[in-house]
């Protein structure tokens, strides 16, 4: 799957994280 920054960020925020970033085409969530 291709990681889309906007989608990833929104997804992470919905799950209670502060932000999301694409790393090696994977969505990673960050609490800060």
From Swiss-Prot:
Keywords for this protein: Disulfide bond, Ion channel impairing toxin, Neurotoxin, Potassium channel impairing toxin, Secreted, Toxin, Voltage-gated potassium channel impairing toxin
Leader sequence residues: none
Site positions (Aromatic residue of the functional dyad): 30
Site (Basic residue of the functional dyad) location in chain: 21
CC annotations in GO: extracellular region
Subcellular location: Secreted
InterPro entries referenced in this protein's UniProt entry, alphabetically: Scorpion_toxin-like_sf (IPR036574), Scorpion_toxinS_K_inh (IPR001947)
Pfam families assigned: Toxin_2
Tissues and organs where the protein is expressed, per its UniProt entry: Expressed by the venom gland.
Family, per entry: Belongs to the short scorpion toxin superfamily. Potassium channel inhibitor family. Alpha-KTx 10 subfamily.
Record function comment: Blocks human voltage-gated potassium (Kv) channels Kv1.2/KCNA2 and Kv1.3/KCNA3. Does not block human Kv1.1 at 100nM concentration.
Protein name stated in the entry: Potassium channel toxin alpha-KTx 10.6
The species this protein was found in: Centruroides bonito
